[in-house]
């Protein structure tokens, strides 16, 4: 089923899709869901939300998400906790800016401090590997953490990929809202660059990003769901035409010439094709 067909279904029915590379991963996810829904024991997650958001220097994309989504969702009006958390009787923890590091995200997934959060909201850049890069299938859409300075070469210690999910992670019952380019998957052809009906090829084939797959099928019990972007994420997901957070209103058109999530080209020599950061 092409991603484009699913985009159309999403408008009316908000459909999801489940896909893994092996039968074992399907089995683990199915068992996790059945166990979560049928057990008489207390649910494995705590009544807690975590917001994880970066804000790199000289980077409009992450700073916009911080100002218009992460901070209002964390602090509400006047510095008070947002009412949505109070109404839901949730405790809220934040990893914002300098605290949004690779190691802190690993600890969130381990449930080290207060147990596994029921909801994780992350807003960051997503790693983009170019066509032909052998790392693309495993690392596309990896979470770019605050460990990266916002400019210069990016290294493995700066991002959080599928291979960084701890073996002792406690993900069972978690839902992850994952705002990052390629967080959910990658199309074969660029969804936005189709000049003269000649789309630019960006991958050998369409594929789902590995990080959500690993979280959903973790041997210790998988996450219940991951909500993420296929292809690039844009500030039009949360910003209206007047430059303010859009709330539930959807702007009538996309204007690629302004207000898009910036992309940052990485510098530094490497014997392999260079990955880039996408907003």
Question: For the regions a protein language model found, what residue spans apply to each?
Answer:
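Alpha-helical scaffolding within the catalytic cores
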Residues: 33-35, 157-167, 208-214
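Structured catalytic cores of large enzymes
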Residues: 1-119, 125-135, 139
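Active-site-proximal C-terminal subdomain of hydrolase catalytic domains
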Residues: 52-59, 68, 179-279
């Amino acid at each position: 089923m092409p991603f484009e067909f699913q985009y159309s279904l999403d408008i009316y029915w908000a459909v999801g899709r489940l896909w893994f590379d092996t039968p074992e991963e399907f089995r683990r996810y199915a068992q996790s869901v059945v166990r979560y829904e049928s057990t008489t024991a207390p649910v494995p997650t705590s009544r807690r939300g975590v917001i994880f958001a970066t804000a790199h220097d000289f980077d409009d994309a992450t700073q916009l998400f911080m100002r218009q989504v992460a901070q209002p969702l964390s602090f509400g009006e006047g510095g008070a906790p947002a009412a949505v958390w109070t109404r839901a009787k949730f405790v809220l923890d934040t990893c914002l800016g300098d605290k949004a590091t690779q190691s802190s995200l690993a600890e969130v997934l381990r449930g080290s401090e207060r147990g596994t959060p029921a909801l994780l909201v992350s807003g960051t850049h997503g790693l983009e590997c170019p066509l032909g890069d052998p790392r693309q299938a495993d690392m596309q859409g990896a979470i770019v953490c605050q460990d990266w300075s916002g400019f210069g070469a990016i290294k493995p210690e700066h991002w959080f990929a599928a291979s960084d999910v701890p073996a002792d992670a406690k993900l069972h019952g978690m839902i992850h809202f994952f705002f990052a380019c390629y967080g959910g998957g990658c199309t074969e052809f660029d969804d936005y660059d189709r000049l003269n009906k000649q789309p630019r090829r960006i991958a050998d084939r369409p594929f789902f990003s590995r990080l959500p797959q690993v979280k959903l099928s973790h041997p210790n019990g998988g996450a219940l769901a991951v909500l993420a972007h296929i292809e690039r994420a844009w500030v039009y997901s949360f910003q209206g035409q007047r430059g303010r957070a859009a709330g539930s209103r959807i702007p009538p058109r996309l204007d690629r010439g302004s207000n898009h999530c910036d992309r940052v080209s990485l510098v530094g020599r490497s014997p392999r094709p260079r990955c880039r950061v996408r907003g």
